[in-house]
């Protein structure tokens, strides 16, 4: 029943929003629609206010990085309609330079979600009232959830006893990076326990 409802919702949104939507997909019991970047405000306002939709709650905003694509980033909006008991995912695609319109005017709760997405991926949001980092430290370099961000990071912070403060310095690996792709010496051994010998002895009788 839920799948039929989502199929009907997808058709309804396509009818009402037309070319503002680039595509839609239904998979694993979830509906995802992809909006044109310049139409995201109109799309979200419609699905928030339309009586058949009423997606009034924004649960999360997140980014996804696909480095091989020209538009390498997806911005994903997770929405909830308590009235219809439905969830909906809305996506837009962008690159490192083109900002995504902030949706804070549509969903005030999106402010910190957009800050987190900016902090982790470097995705810009135009019209955001306070677009600054929210999770990483002051002076942090780069955006840690990008696929091209090094595992070790660029700098490390530590407390310096001489300076009596926290300092930042280039990462120094205490040992060479190693590839641990080998069979563990604790795997595959054929250990025979005393109880096994006893059971085998009873079976032989």
Curated annotation (Swiss-Prot):
<dbReference type="Pfam" id="PF00329">
    <property type="entry name" value="Complex1_30kDa"/>
</dbReference>
<dbReference type="GO" id="GO:0050136">
    <property type="term" value="F:NADH:ubiquinone reductase (non-electrogenic) activity"/>
</dbReference>
<keyword id="KW-0520">NAD</keyword>
<dbReference type="GO" id="GO:0005886">
    <property type="term" value="C:plasma membrane"/>
</dbReference>
<keyword id="KW-0874">Quinone</keyword>
<dbReference type="GO" id="GO:0008137">
    <property type="term" value="F:NADH dehydrogenase (ubiquinone) activity"/>
</dbReference>
<keyword id="KW-0997">Cell inner membrane</keyword>
<comment type="function">
    <text>NDH-1 shuttles electrons from NADH, via FMN and iron-sulfur (Fe-S) centers, to quinones in the respiratory chain. The immediate electron acceptor for the enzyme in this species is believed to be ubiquinone. Couples the redox reaction to proton translocation (for every two electrons transferred, four hydrogen ions are translocated across the cytoplasmic membrane), and thus conserves the redox energy in a proton gradient.</text>
</comment>
<dbReference type="InterPro" id="IPR037232">
    <property type="entry name" value="NADH_quin_OxRdtase_su_C/D-like"/>
</dbReference>
<dbReference type="GO" id="GO:0048038">
    <property type="term" value="F:quinone binding"/>
</dbReference>
<keyword id="KW-1278">Translocase</keyword>
<comment type="similarity">
    <text>Belongs to the complex I 30 kDa subunit family.</text>
</comment>
<keyword id="KW-0830">Ubiquinone</keyword>
<dbReference type="InterPro" id="IPR020396">
    <property type="entry name" value="NADH_UbQ_OxRdtase_CS"/>
</dbReference>
<comment type="subunit">
    <text>NDH-1 is composed of 14 different subunits. Subunits NuoB, C, D, E, F, and G constitute the peripheral sector of the complex.</text>
</comment>
<dbReference type="InterPro" id="IPR010218">
    <property type="entry name" value="NADH_DH_suC"/>
</dbReference>
<dbReference type="InterPro" id="IPR001268">
    <property type="entry name" value="NADH_UbQ_OxRdtase_30kDa_su"/>
</dbReference>
<keyword id="KW-0472">Membrane</keyword>
<keyword id="KW-1003">Cell membrane</keyword>
<keyword id="KW-0813">Transport</keyword>
<protein>
    <recommendedName>
        <fullName>NADH-quinone oxidoreductase subunit C</fullName>
        <ecNumber>7.1.1.-</ecNumber>
    </recommendedName>
</protein>
